[in-house]
Curated annotation (Swiss-Prot):
GO MF entries: ATP binding; ATP hydrolysis activity; DNA binding; excinuclease ABC activity; zinc ion binding
Subunit structure: Forms a heterotetramer with UvrB during the search for lesions.
Residues annotated to bind ATP: 32-39, 641-648
Pfam families listed in its UniProt record: UvrA_DNA-bind (PF17755), UvrA_inter (PF17760)
Name used for this protein in its record: UvrABC system protein A
GO cellular component: cytoplasm; excinuclease repair complex
Function: The UvrABC repair system catalyzes the recognition and processing of DNA lesions. UvrA is an ATPase and a DNA-binding protein. A damage recognition complex composed of 2 UvrA and 2 UvrB subunits scans DNA for abnormalities. When the presence of a lesion has been verified by UvrB, the UvrA molecules dissociate.
Top-level taxon: Bacteria
Gene name of the record: uvrA
Keywords assigned: ATP-binding, Cytoplasm, DNA damage, DNA excision, DNA repair, DNA-binding, Excision nuclease, Metal-binding, Nucleotide-binding, Repeat, SOS response, Zinc, Zinc-finger
GO biological process annotation, one example: SOS response
Predominant localisation class: cytoplasm
Compartments in which it is found: Cytoplasm
Length: 965
């Protein structure tokens, strides 16, 4: 087998005819500026060709079920293995996918519970075990030999009637004593039972003291009792009838209520199968309901003024119902909703129950008619309309009032009652899936089951333990197996897939990874790199697109692509060992690694103003432990902490949702908190995350940033366009008029090829230009609208520098390092980091008031050291304008330049959720329990770290505020 992957003439996207040789079975890191062509080489060339060749080796029938990659633009490639790509893209948007199901650990857990689980009665908690007569006798012989006992057979359980026939049958069979409702009687003197009351009748089969010499007698007595009691029997002391009886069953059922289960099988524990799913929520764990908080959109207004949309004066039909209600219950329809009595509000929302109300209806002729009936209620009315309508538009409108809540039937466990009551070592399956992965691993390490159960469990437990161990190795010990897949970050999803691949144990495969260190704290980096080297040591080629310094330093072979981004990139600046990269004169990466170039620490940090702070008190969502957060206004604040410590819950789920609802008038669900103070300092809140800017190829940077509108208006002002009467709409590829109708403005036509990949061919009418010939005849400075969309941001800025409305938006795209993007580049081709920076540029182009609260979640994703330097300049510029910038970040270069750092921890999951320290980076670096501080100290001058706890009189306060320790 060849020892090299040979690539010749790679021209995918912006790659400039690259020729290179990569060593196989090594850890290769591809680095370079954002947009320089790293992903084009790793994913769109090497992975695409490896995958394509493997799939093409399959039969034509099999190929039609697989997505075949497009053939990359290159001359030759040799030495490829079958390729597996592990990307950042979110794992699944399916609400049924969880960490357990993705990793297949849940499948092993289902098998474990089906084979060795101990079912119990949900009501009486007795194990469902079919006992033999010998087992029953052996159990009785362990009882106190000094006590007297009686053996009972239940004949009637909790049934109404006098039961005279039962007593006659028992008498005829030779029984002399019975126990009725807990009282012992001779069978001839049983009192007459009350006809309409429930009674329990048990026949006394035997009375004894437990001794070895009565073993045979006991066995015969038990056989009689089981026959009479339909497989049930009980033993009770004769001296004190208040003690709990010993219950026995020869059937697989509860000895008290006869509850039974069919044989356990893995399907019973699957929330995706009808056999195991909770019937109330169909295995989703949540139910939808019309939320009164969303129905009453303006509680400060009156019903007549629009407290409930659609039920005010403007809607005559529904308002006449409210008017009749007001008359019946004597409340004022002009009083605010908040001031109405609770019972009145409940009646309006949920109906009048059985109470009949006189309603006055207006007829079409203008008259009035009276009718008496119950009031349905606003919420039941919405539910009925949602259920009965066949209109998608009506459903979409009504869905605005719907919220989700934990299923009241299963408590969010997704499983039905039977599956929730099967135990392994006194734990149910839902109890295991809510444990953090490191605790679950500990449970399985110490799990010892007796007898045959232990023998069966040993192999299953080994598989579960290994897979849990892999998740811990990639830094995901804080996750739980029941965590929904659609709540995972890109980095978490990628590392889960990485753990699954290690579990597969394949050899001779080529793995291509996209920034696996995203969202990972420096502390966990070592474990991740250990995982990558383990994959390599198995005999695989591991190709990683990465910017993390530790990963670059640990690579066997480094490839630096550049020198710039977009059209300025696509070349190999340097390749080889770490030393070769550091010595290469053209390598920007080498300059940062060698220390010749670095991101500087600010000479002076902006001090916080104690009188201008945003105070959030008692935040306790997910794993937060009543956190009290203080954010200084007008500063650049970093939120740090190990993965799973609660950063996203505190900032995204609590602070942002709260501020957006209060300031922007949004209606996000807010994680629980006690109080908030200081929101009046801000007039706008902006959250810039990494979700895509558009999910269709028609969305692009020009449309998203709002630049396309002034661009179309500019073309409509060209003399030729005015002469023809063209409006700005003529230059849109989304509406009829100016677009090419053959391809409906796509520029491409999809040709389905079945077992080959779908081919997109340029439209043969417009030749891929999206517009019709007449529209393309309109030119501005010699360029038509298609030429402009094909331009890079950099080139477009030169063309439109005299048009402020367009130039301002282009300048901000350049500021955030996106000068290489084409204006019309499809949004679906942008990486998460690029999408986030497009959003940032959109916000930057708006006129800010200096009172905006910006929240960014890991903005350095996908960024090279050089890009980070440019991003920091933008963030500091926002701060200098008086705005408040909050960044959730692991990157130490960003943290060291912050004015204020708030570090959460100390660990992830249940062992996190507290603020360890809040202060300057120097203060955090000096904190003994902060993992962030430990790594940060290495980047800060030693004197700062040692002196951070001391200050001269009058010096600004920058010492750490230590909380919860």
């Amino acid at each position: 087998m060849t020892a090299l992957i040979r690539i010749r003439g790679a021209r995918t996207h912006n790659l400039k005819n690259l020729d290179l040789d990569l060593p196989r079975n090594t850890l290769i890191v591809i680095t370079g500026l954002s947009g320089s062509g790293k992903s084009s080489l790793a994913f769109d060339t090497i992975y695409a060709e490896g995958q394509r060749r493997y799939v093409e080796s399959l039969s034509a029938y099999a190929r039609q079920f697989l997505s075949v990659m497009e053939k990359p633009d290159l001359d030759q490639i040799e030495g490829l293995s079958p390729a597996i790509s592990i990307e950042q893209k979110s794992t699944s948007h399916n609400p049924r996918s969880t960490v357990g199901t993705i990793t297949e650990i849940y499948d092993y857990l289902r098998l474990l519970y089906a084979r060795v689980g101990q079912p119990r009665c949900p009501d009486h908690h007795y194990p469902l075990e079919a006992q033999t007569v010998s087992q029953m006798v052996d159990h009785v012989l362990t009882l106190d030999p000094e006590q007297r006992y009686m053996l009972l057979a239940p004949v009637v359980r909790e049934r109404k009637g006098e039961h005279t026939q039962v007593f006659e049958q028992l008498r005829a069979q030779g029984f002399v004593r019975v126990r009725v409702d807990g009282e012992l009687y001779e069978i001839d003197v049983v009192p007459t039972l009350t006809l309409r009351q429930k009674h329990t009748i048990e026949a006394v089969i035997d009375r004894f003291r437990p001794r070895e010499d009565i073993k045979q007698r006991l066995a015969e007595s038990f056989e009689t009792a089981l026959k009479l009691g339909n497989g049930m029997a009980s033993v009770q002391t004769l001296d004190t009838t208040t003690t709990t009886p010993h219950l026995f069953s020869s059937k697989y059922s509860c000895p008290v209520c006869d509850y039974s289960l069919p044989e356990l099988e893995p399907r019973l524990f699957s929330f995706n199968a009808p056999m195991g799913a909770c019937p109330a929520c169909n295995g989703l764990g949540v139910t939808e309901f019309f939320d009164p908080a969303k129905v009453v959109i303006h509680p400060d207004l009156s019903l007549s003024a629009g407290a409930v949309r659609g039920w005010d004066r403007r809607n005559a039909y529904y308002f006449q119902l409210i008017a009749s209600l007001a008359k019946h219950y004597t409340f004022d329809i002009d009083a605010s909703w908040e001031s109405l009595p609770e019972e009145i509000r409940h009646t309006i929302l949920f109906g009048s129950g059985d109470e009949q109300i006189n309603f006055i209806y207006l007829t079409e002729a203008g008259g009035r008619t009276k009718r008496k009936h119950r009031f349905e209620g606003i919420v039941p009315n919405l539910e009925r309309r949602y259920r009965e309508t066949e209109s998608a538009a009506v459903r979409e409108e009504l869905a605005k009032y719907v919220s989700t809540r934990t299923c009241p039937e299963c408590g969010g466990t997704r499983l039905n009652r039977a599956a929730r009551n099967v135990f392994v070592a006194d734990r149910t399956l839902p109890e295991l899936t809510v444990l953090p992965i490191n605790d679950a691993l500990e449970f399985f390490k110490t799990l010892r089951l007796p007898g045959w159960r232990g023998e069966i469990a040993i192999k299953i437990v080994k598989e579960i333990g290994e897979r849990l161990g892999f998740l811990v190795d990639v830094g995901l010990d804080y996750l739980t197996l029941e965590r929904k897949a659609d709540t995972l970050s890109g980095g978490e999803a990628q590392r889960i897939r990485l753990a699954s691949q290690i579990g597969a144990g394949l050899v001779g495969v080529m793995y291509v990874l996209d920034e696996p260190s995203i969202g990972l704290h420096q502390r966990d980096n070592e474990r991740l790199l250990g995982t990558l080297t383990r994959l390599r040591d198995l005999g695989n080629t591991v190709i990683v697109v990465e910017h993390d310094e530790d990963a670059i330093r640990q690579a066997d072979h480094i490839l630096d692509i550049g020198p710039g981004a977009g059209v300025h990139g696509g070349e190999i600046c340097a390749q080889g060992s770490l030393e070769q990269i550091m010595a290469a004169p053209r390598s920007l990466t080498g300059q940062y690694l060698s220390g010749r170039r670095r991101i500087e620490i600010p000479k002076q940090r902006h001090p916080p103003n104690a009188t201008k702070m945003l105070h959030l008190r008692g935040a306790c969502g997910n794993n937060l432990k009543g956190v009290n957060l203080d954010i200084p206004e007008g500063l650049f604040t970093c939120i740090t902490g190990v993965s799973g410590s609660g950063k996203s819950t505190l900032i995204n789920d609590t602070l942002f949702t709260l501020a957006a609802n209060e300031i922007n008038g949004a209606s996000h669900p807010i994680a629980p908190y006690a109080s908030v103070d200081g929101l009046e300092l801000f007039d706008k809140v902006v959250d810039i995350d990494q979700s895509p800017i558009g999910r269709t190829p028609r969305s692009n940077p020009a449309t998203y940033t709002g630049m396309f509108t002034p661009l179309r208006e500019l073309f409509a002002q060209v003399p030729e366009a005015r002469a023809r009467g063209y409006s700005p709409g003529r230059f849109s590829f989304n509406v009829r008029g100016g677009r090419c109708e053959a391809c409906e403005g796509d520029g491409l036509i999809k040709v389905e090829m079945h077992f080959l990949p779908d081919v997109y061919v340029p439209c043969d009418v417009c030749h891929g230009k999206r517009y019709n010939r007449e529209t393309l005849e309109i030119r501005y400075k010699g360029y038509n609208i298609n030429d402009v969309l094909e331009m890079t941001v950099e080139d477009a800025l030169k063309l439109f520098e005299a048009v402020p409305a367009i130039a301002r938006k282009l300048e901000t795209l350049v500021d955030v390092g996106l000068s290489y993007l084409k204006l019309g580049q499809s949004a679906t081709t942008l990486s998460g980091g690029e999408a986030q920076r497009v959003k940032l540029s959109k916000e930057l182009s708006r006129r800010d008031t200096g009172r905006t609260l910006y929240i960014l979640d890991e903005p350095t994703t996908g960024l090279h050291f050089y890009d980070i330097e440019a991003l920091l300049a933008v963030l500091h510029k926002l701060r200098d304008a008086g705005n408040t910038v909050i960044v959730i970040e692991h990157n130490l270069d960003v943290i060291k330049t912050a004015d204020w750092v708030i570090d959460l921890g100390p660990e992830g999951g249940g062992r996190g959720g507290e603020i360890l320290v809040a202060g300057t980076p120097e203060a955090v670096a000096a904190h003994p329990h902060s993992h962030t501080g430990h790594f940060l100290a290495k980047l800060l001058p030693p004197k700062d770290v040692s002196n951070c706890g001391h200050r001269d009189p009058g010096e600004e306060v920058d010492i750490a505020q230590t909380v919860h320790r």
